[in-house]
Amino acid sequence: MYTNLPKACLTGIVLTISTHSGPQVVYHYPPVKQPVEARRGRKVDSRNERVRSWQAGRMPSAASGAVDAVGEGVDGLEEESSESELDRSSGLSESEVSTDWADYSMSSSDSESEMREDGGGESSAVGGSSAAEGGEESLAEGADSSIAWPGPSESYNQLLESQSMVGSSANVAAASTKPKSIKSRHSQISANKLFQYLTNTSDADSRRQSVFSKLTGNEDSETIRLTDSVNLLDLESLLEDLEPGLADVDISELLDVEVFQPGRFQDVSKIFNFDAEFVAELCSPPKEMCNTRFELTVDDLCFLGLPIHVDESGRWRKQKVKRQQTNTRSKRSSSGGKPDAGSRTSVGLPHGTQERQPSTDQSGSGAPYLAQSSSESGQLRDPEQSDDVEDLQKAVHMFHVCFIMNPQLVEYNERIDDMYHYIVTRLSLILRYIQDKKGYVVRECAKILKTRDRILKKSLKLKKSHGQALQGRYLYECILKSSSLARALTKCFNSIINNEIVTLDIDNHKVISLQIPIKNEFSSLPDLKINPVLRGSYLTSLLNDSFLKQPVDFAAGSMMPGGDVMHDDNDVLDYALLLLDDTPKIIKDLEFSSFGSDLANVIMINLVKNLKPTVSLRSYLPLVSNLLEANLSLSARAAGSRHAASNAADSHSTPLQHSMIRSIVLHLVYWRYARIILPLSSKNTYIVSPLAPIRGTAADDFENTDMVKQGCKALIYQHQDLFHEKFPTLPTLPSFLSSISTCKPRSFGHLIPSKDHNLLYLSVLAWLIRYGYLTQLLTFVWLRVDRRIKIAVDEDLEREGVRTWNSIVKKEHRQNPHDNVAAPTREPASSAIDETASSSEHGDANISDGQESLDDYLFKESDYTIILEPKTATALEKRWLFKCIENQPTEMQLLFRKVIKYFNGKTPLELVEIKENIPKQELKKLIACLDKYVVELKHW
C-alpha cells in the first residue's frame, strides 16, 4: 500500500442518460479490454484467451451478446458456450438482467430489411447504444473477413417474427455471410429469455417511436452520398452537416495511440468486458438514489459518480429565491462600489466564471433555455433536427458521469473518497448547472448519438478501414470533433491518470479546474521502504496543507467588532511565497484558466510578477492597494463621481487587501504554482534534505530503476544539467551540496563570498528548495522551571499571604489531571510511600490527607517542569516563568513578555522574528539571559 504516492486508480469514464425508454451509454473512454493487466495477471490471462479465440473465429464469445437488446423489451440472442462463462463476462446472471428499459423502435425493422437487401454488408442502427454497436460490428465484418461473427439461428428469427418482435440486433447479419460452422450450432437461449419472448404479446406497430430512434434513425439517405474513393472530404462532409467548423477541431492531444492498438482495443459496444447495456442499467439508479453519492463495486471495478436527476417541476437544480432589494442595499450599492469588508473575496478560484445573461423565463422546465442555447451555438440549422433535440431535452430525466476505478483493497476508501470529493462532485455539479441554464449536456449527447449513427452507416472511410482498432479510432475522432463534452471528458481522464491539473472550458460559459492533490510534504521522515514518497518531496514542519485546511474565518482574517482584522498566530501573510515554475509560464497558465478581464485575475498576475521568496507577503499590501485605487479611479472617471475617488484614496491597508492576498496565495498553493515558506535569508541555516532526489530516474521512480538498462540518468545528474544552465559560474550541483552538508550546520551566509554575490546565492538557495534538495533548520524553544524557582515562588506567596503553597498545589493539581506541565523526572523516595501507607491505618479520614501529601511531595521533588503552552499557563505557572527573568535588564523583561507565548515548541524562532519584527541578535540575547531555563531544539 503506497498511500504517499499519487495514484488515481482511474480506468475509465462513462456518460449515461436515461429517458422514458430506458438508460443509454452515450460515451465512454478508453475502449480497452483490461485496465490493470500488470497487477491482476491471474484474471487477465483467462479473459484474453477468450478474446483471442473469439477473434480467430474458433468459438463465439458469450460476452458479445450477454445483454444486447433485440427489439421490444427483449435481450439479444447469445451464442454462449456455458452459463458460468456468461456470468464472468457480464457480471450478472441472465435472470438478474433487467429488460424494462429496452428501446422500442420502429426503425429497426426498416434497418433490418435494408441490411438483407444489401447482402449483409451494412448494419443499421437501433435506438440506444446497440445502434452504434451493430453498425460497427457489421462494418468491421465487411472490412476484415478473417473475423467470424456469430448470429442467431433461423428458428429463433422465425420465433421473433411470429411474436411481432422483429428488431435489429447489434450482432445480427445476413445468414449468407456467416460461416457454416457457427450458423446455428451455437445459437442457444435460456428458459428465462424464452419465457420473456412468449409472454410479450404487444405489437411493435403499436409502440410509439422513442426519442433515440427519432434522433438516429430519421436520416435522409441523400444528405451524404458515398463515393468509390476514400478521401478526407468524407469526414469533413459528415461533420459540417452537423455544425460548421467541426472538421477543424484539433484533437491530436486527446486520443492515446496505444489505446487503439489491436492488442488493447476493445469493441466500442463493450466496457471492460461488460456490455454497454449492462453498464447503462448499472449506472442508472432510481430517482430516490440520484443527486447523492453513487458507489457500486462489480468484480474488481468500482463505479463512482453523482447521478443528476430532474425534480418534480422539471428543473435540474433548485432555484434560489430572489430577495427584494431594500433601501439599505440600494444605498450601499450606490456608495462608490466599495465591497463589504466582511465578505470573503473569491480570487481566481477554480469555479470562477464569467456567465452570460441568463434567460428571464422561469416557467419551471429546462425547455425554455433550449431555443436560446441552440441559436447561440449555431449547431441546429435544420428544423427537423431542432425538433428532435427538443424532444430529447424533454425526455431525458437523468444524466450520470460515472468514473470507473480499480483501487486495491487496502487503499480503497482513501482513493475512492479523494476521487469523489475532488473530481466527481465538482464536475457533476458544474454540468448540472450548465444543463439547467442552457441544456448543454443533453444537447451534446444528441451530437454524440447523431455523429455515431452517421459515421457507422454512411462513412466510406470507416468501411474501408481494416480491423476494429482502426475503425474504433476513426469513430472516436469523429465523436471528439463533434462534441465539446466528449472532449472535456477525455481530457479529464487523460489528466487525472497522469496526476495533472485539468482545466475544462464548459460550453464557453464556465471554466473549471480539477485535480487530486498530491502528497509531497512531510513533517516527519517517512519509512521509505514500506511507504515510499515522490522524489524531491519537501521535509518541513511548515506544511502548506495546514493553511489550506484552515477555516474561512482564519483564511480571510477574523473580524473584530470595531472592523479591524484579528490576525491568527499562524497568519499566511507572515510567510513568503516560492514559485515552483518560471514566472512567464505561470502567468500564461493563469491567463488560460481564468478570464483576463477579471480584476482579481489582474491583481493575481501583477502579484506573481513581483513575488520574491525573500520578502514576506505582508509587504505586498501597498501593491494591491495601488491596483485597487487605479481601478476605482477608472470607475470614478467613467461614472463621473468624486465619491468613488475619495474612497480610493482611503483604501490603503483595509481588510479587503488582506483577504485578497490570502485568497491569491491559497489559490497559487492549491494549484501547485507556489509553496509557502519562511522568507529566505542568508542568516538562516539550511541542510540537505533526507528526501533529496539523489536516486531514481524520475519523481515517481521509487523502485530505483536500473539506470544502465533503462539508459537514463539519475535525477541528481538530470538536475545538474539544469543547475549548470541556470548558474554557469557556480560549482556543480553535487559539489555545492557537499559544501552545505557539513558536520555542524552553519548559516547559509558562510557560503557567500561577498555582498555582491548575495542575490546570486539567494537565487541558488531558492532553486535548491524548489527541487527539494534543501530544507530549513528551524529553532524551537520550551521553558523549564527547576526546583529553586518553585521554592522562590512559594516563599513569595507566603509573604504576600495569599494562600499557602500546599493549598494552591492541591487545588490546581486536582482540577487539572492533564495539566500544562511535563511529567516529573524523578521517582519518589520509598520512605514517603511507606509513610503514606502507614497513615492509612488510622482510618478513612487520614486517607485523603496522605494522598495530598504524596502529591505535594511528587510535585516539589521533581527536578524541573517544562511549560508546554505559556500562552494558556495558569497563574502559578506564569509566576514561575516571570521569576526566571526577574534579575535581568528591563528591556529583556519586556521582550520576554512579548515573545513568551511563542516558547511552546511549535512556533519557530525564525517566524517570531518576522511576526514581531524583532532582530535576530535581540532574540539571541534573550535566549542567553534565560540560559539554563531554555530547552532549545533544532529541527526541520
From Swiss-Prot:
Signal peptide limits: 1-21
A GO term from the CC aspect: GATOR1 complex
Keyword Signal: yes
GO BP: any one term: negative regulation of TORC1 signaling
Pfam families: HTH_NPRL3, NPR3
Bias kind Low complexity: ranges: 61-72, 123-133
Keyword vocabulary terms for this entry: Meiosis, Signal
Keyword Signal carried by entry: yes
Biased composition (Basic and acidic residues): 37-52
Acidic residues biased stretches: 75-84
Biased composition (Polar residues): 324-336, 355-378
UniProt-annotated stretches for the region Disordered: 37-155, 317-387, 812-848
InterPro entries linked: HTH_NPRL3, Npr3
Function statement: Mediates inactivation of the TORC1 complex in response to amino acid starvation. Required for meiotic nuclear division.
Family membership noted in the UniProt record: Belongs to the NPR3 family.
Protein name as it appears in the record: Nitrogen permease regulator 3
Organism this protein belongs to: Eremothecium gossypii (strain ATCC 10895 / CBS 109.51 / FGSC 9923 / NRRL Y-1056) (Yeast)
